[in-house]
């Protein structure tokens, strides 16, 4: 006989947080949102990869490209580049993010002394960069022989056939810094010598990076930027359970910091095969998340398979219609509460803490805090990020309102046979996502700052200043339908201010 759950499943909107004692320490500026991204032995070692804010962007064509990945990494979060594209194009997106190093920039424009002014101008037109490194082999890490900037030539007075060696600033006239130089030290040198660009060289005088004066303000503006040991932005990449034998090596070679299996339902042998492939070929050096699941059994399965984190949620996304078309899924809040308990149980048994990601169901900013209180270590957001300038879709004017396009990976538009098909066919028999618009909201930086300030303020109301303390000490209450109505404005007539109802 089929098993029937005794209680209905619930969404975030059916819960409220009950305030706790707020001490003098509980102010937003003292709240830390740092949170683990991958599994580790909690209490015995530091987490190998942590997020500075509990936000990752969804593995979607309409959300996560390299532009959004850089913007989110600057704020302390992580993007998973969408996998519903060719292996080559996904790997190239990853490479572009990894080359956008925070402060230390790998030279994208490189020539030899034997090239010409015409080559310099062509590179500037192609890449948009005015600084060209001159190395022995025209490689970004070749022996440094000089640099060319717009100050070194005048197109109106020089022949485009002129050799670079005749107008470049030679090595002996350059001020450089060793590869051990910190970003602060590099900026100090730039300001002391009034430089626009500082080459960073190794012990063999080979170029490693540039540090640019123009980036100084940006460094100060993004203190939580998520970086690796080489000061490059962190980036994730989505994979599927079909072409992973070819896709994973390409993404690892491109520099992806973490992978995530993109599937509407993760409690399957297909996910085990993908994780087994990673462990057999890379051991624990390659990190991989899996999902999605909605109960204890699904979590235990993926944790025991070796997943580095587990995604929770089926059918809760704003463009996902899996529940409607297949009749499978569960209320996001109920799913998260059960999986969080399973995560803690697994930790007590093994000493290994496997972070969980709440994927879907976030409609309002306060839902973020609820999800964290219910046990999520971080949140995967699609619609939220699709609204911003940095998302890859078009901004349109529809009925007098600016919107951005937003479509699900289960829609025909995404052509995502790799997520849903199980029998080898590449057609999509039916859709599990819709094609839609979301209201345009402006820049990622401004909106993320506003949302996270609300999260921090709510945490202070709960008497906590860290996510682990919120998970441990939060008090939540299920509310009735009339309580939900009571929580909004009622029994009044709103005044029209010309600025909306804000």
Regions found by a protein language model. Name each.
Residues 44-48, 73, 98, 121-125, ...:
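Surface-exposed amphipathic alpha-helices with a cationic face
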Residues 48-57, 103-108, 228-237, 278-294, ...:
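Short beta-strand/loop segments at the ligand-binding rim of alpha/beta enzyme cores
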Residues 67-70, 244-254, 288, 294-312, ...:
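Catalytic cores of alpha/beta
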Residues 80-85, 109-112, 131-135, 176-178, ...:
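Catalytic beta/alpha-barrel core
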């Amino acid at each position: 006989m089929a098993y029937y759950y005794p209680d209905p499943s619930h969404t975030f909107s059916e819960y409220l947080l009950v305030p706790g004692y707020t001490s003098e320490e509980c102010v937003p500026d003292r709240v830390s949102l740092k949170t683990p991204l991958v599994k580790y032995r909690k209490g015995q070692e530091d987490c190998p990869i942590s997020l500075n804010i509990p936000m990752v962007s969804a593995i979607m064509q309409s959300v996560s490209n390299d532009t959004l990945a850089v913007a989110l990494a600057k704020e302390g979060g992580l993007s998973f580049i969408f996998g519903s594209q060719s292996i080559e194009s996904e790997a190239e997106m990853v490479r572009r993010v990894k080359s956008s190093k925070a402060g230390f920039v790998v030279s994208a424009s490189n020539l030899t002394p034997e090239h010409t002014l015409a080559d310099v101008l062509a590179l500037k037109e192609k890449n948009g960069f005015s600084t060209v490194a001159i190395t022995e082999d025209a490689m970004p890490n070749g022996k440094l022989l000089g640099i060319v900037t717009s100050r070194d030539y005048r197109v109106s007075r020089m022949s485009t056939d002129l050799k670079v060696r005749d107008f470049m600033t030679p090595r002996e006239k350059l001020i450089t810094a060793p590869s051990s130089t910190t970003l602060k030290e590099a900026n100090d040198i730039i300001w002391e010598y009034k430089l626009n660009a500082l080459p960073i060289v190794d012990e063999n005088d080979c170029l490693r990076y540039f540090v640019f004066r123009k980036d100084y303000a940006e460094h100060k503006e993004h203190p939580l930027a998520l970086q690796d040991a080489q000061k490059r932005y962190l980036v994730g990449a989505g994979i599927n359970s079909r072409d992973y034998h070819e896709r994973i090596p390409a993404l690892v070679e491109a520099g992806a910091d973490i992978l995530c299996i993109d599937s509407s339902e993760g409690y399957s042998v297909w996910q085990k095969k993908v994780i087994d492939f990673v462990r057999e070929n890379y051991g624990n050096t390659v990190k991989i998340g899996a999902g999605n699941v909605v109960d204890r059994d699904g979590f235990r399965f993926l944790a025991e398979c070796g997943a580095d984190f587990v995604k929770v949620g089926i059918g809760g996304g704003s463009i996902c219609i899996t529940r409607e078309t297949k009749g499978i899924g569960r209320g996001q809040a109920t799913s998260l509460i059960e999986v969080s308990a399973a995560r803690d149980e697994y930790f007590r048994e093994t000493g290994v803490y496997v972070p969980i990601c709440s994927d879907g169901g976030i409609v309002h900013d306060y839902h973020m805090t609820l999800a964290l209180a219910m046990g999520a270590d971080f949140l995967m957001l699609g619609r939220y990020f699709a609204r911003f300038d940095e998302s890859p879709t078009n901004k349109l004017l529809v009925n007098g309102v600016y919107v951005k396009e937003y479509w699900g990976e289960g829609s025909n538009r995404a052509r995502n046979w790799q997520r849903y098909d199980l029998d080898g066919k590449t057609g999509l028999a039916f859709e599990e996502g819709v094609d839609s618009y979301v209201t345009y909201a402006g820049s990622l930086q401004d909106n993320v700052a506003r949302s996270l300030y609300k999260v921090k303020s709510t945490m202070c109301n709960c008497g906590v200043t860290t996510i682990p303390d919120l998970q441990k000490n939060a008090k939540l209450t299920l509310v009735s339908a009339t309580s939900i109505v009571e929580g909004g404005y009622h029994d009044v007539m709103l005044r029209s201010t010309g600025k909306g109802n804000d």
